[in-house]
Amino acid sequence: GFTHYHADHISGLPGLLLSMGNAERTEPLTMIGPKGLERVVGALRMIAPELPFEIRYIEIMEPEADIEINGYHIHAFRVNHNITCYGYTVEIRRAGRFSVEHAKEREIPQKYWNRLQKGEEIETEDGAHYTPDMVLGAARKGIKVTYCTDTRPTESLVASAKNSDLLICEGMYAEKEKIAKAKQYKHMTFYEAAEVAKKAEVAEMWLTHFSPSLVHAEDYMPQVREIFPNAFLGKDGKSVEPVSYTHLRAHETPEHL
């Protein structure tokens, strides 16, 4: 998903597409972004015109949008930058537990239980209609990751990131005295990002999108952690296994996880 169309966020696309092609990818690639996505990608593809896979476009026109792709629920939300910009929440939702009692109460034949547990709706030859909610309990906690960059703090960000396992958040400026610059160019300081994480009650936050002038970013983290203790600097190759993941069974995770 593209957050917005400033050069530092889109110029690497042609190389990525070519790498996918060289890796013999053939399945379609879905791209999500603000209005103008297909036009922007088309221009960038001048140097990557021949690809062995189809590109599909989802352009976001409204302040918020909800998209389902391959078992992932994606929520796009408008943020506050100097051009149209979105943040994204990606969730792997987890269905409730299968209830034998519910299935028996509704006299659902046992041969359909497994299919219903997997989320399938069933229409029988004799006209009976069975849905997963007839045999499943309340939804359980899945995995939720929120990503935003190039924005001032917004209520939409706090609301969308609520209870995320991980918030990947811009922190353009570490120096507190650069707050005026952050407001002018529609970015955040480390400390504003920490306040967002605190209000959203996320489990963990990674700061990213640092100013090129920033050196020794780690020196500022003790002050950041006074606001939100579980804050870290993002870096290439960094990974984490959310606590929620340990409670997901393999068959409950989407394809290509």
Give the positions of each predicted feature:
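Active-site metal-binding motif and surrounding structural segment of the metallo-beta-lactamase
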Residues: 1-32, 57-61
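Active-site neighborhood of phospho(di)ester-bond hydrolases with catalytic His/Asp-centered motifs
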Residues: 1-5, 146-149, 168-170, 205-208, ...
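Active-site environment of divalent metal-dependent phosphoester hydrolases
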Residues: 7-9, 82-84, 153-156, 174-176, ...
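Metal-dependent catalytic neighborhoods of phosphoester/phosphodiester hydrolases
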Residues: 12-19, 215-223
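Active-site-proximal loop/helix segment associated with metal-binding centers of metalloenzymes
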Residues: 72-147, 151-160, 166-168
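Charged helix-capping and loop-helix junction motifs
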Residues: 183-191
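Short, electropositive alpha-helical surface patch
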Residues: 217-237
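Conserved small/polar residues in nucleotide/adenosyl-binding loops
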Residues: 246-255
